[in-house]
């Protein structure tokens, strides 16, 4: 009985520790999502996305919608790292930090940017963008 209780508690902790923060709403071509466990999953529509995932596209495009309605389009030959995502659906506040390290990414603000503007950051290898509730695209070119 004791073993069963420990197992049940560990399963509940794991489920809460790895809650989905959004999902892939559109995917074309090839791409993958690297998990913190080191495993990679082929990107498909409706695939769950988690904090600390790394989204990579080859000859394709991946569109992610987070639970706060933030939308990020990762175009071909791009890489996006989800550094932080915290969201309280009751207050519609939280924090979002993304790192675009290659290619082109389009960002459209959701509830976090509308209600916690100071807590949204998009960074690149050479700059950080403080988002103030907007829609923009950025391209990174390696020379």
Predicted stretch roles:
Residues 18-59, 63-141:
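Flexible, surface-exposed loop/linker segments and immediately adjacent secondary-structure boundaries
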Residues 5-13:
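Bacterial N-terminal signal peptides
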């Amino acid at each position: 009985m004791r073993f069963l209780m420990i197992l049940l508690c560990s399963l509940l902790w794991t489920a809460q520790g790895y809650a989905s923060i959004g999902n892939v709403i559109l995917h074309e071509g090839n791409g993958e999502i690297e998990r913190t466990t080191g495993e990679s999953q082929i990107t498909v529509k409706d695939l769950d996305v988690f904090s600390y995932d790394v989204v990579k596209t080859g000859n394709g495009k991946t569109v992610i919608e987070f639970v706060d309605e933030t939308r990020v389009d990762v175009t071909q030959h791009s890489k996006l790292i989800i550094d932080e995502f915290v969201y309280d659906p009751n207050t519609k506040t939280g924090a979002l930090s993304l790192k675009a390290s290659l290619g082109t990414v389009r960002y459209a603000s959701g509830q976090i940017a509308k209600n916690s503007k100071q807590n949204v950051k998009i960074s690149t290898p050479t700059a950080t963008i403080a988002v103030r509730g907007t829609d923009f695209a950025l391209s990174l070119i390696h020379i």
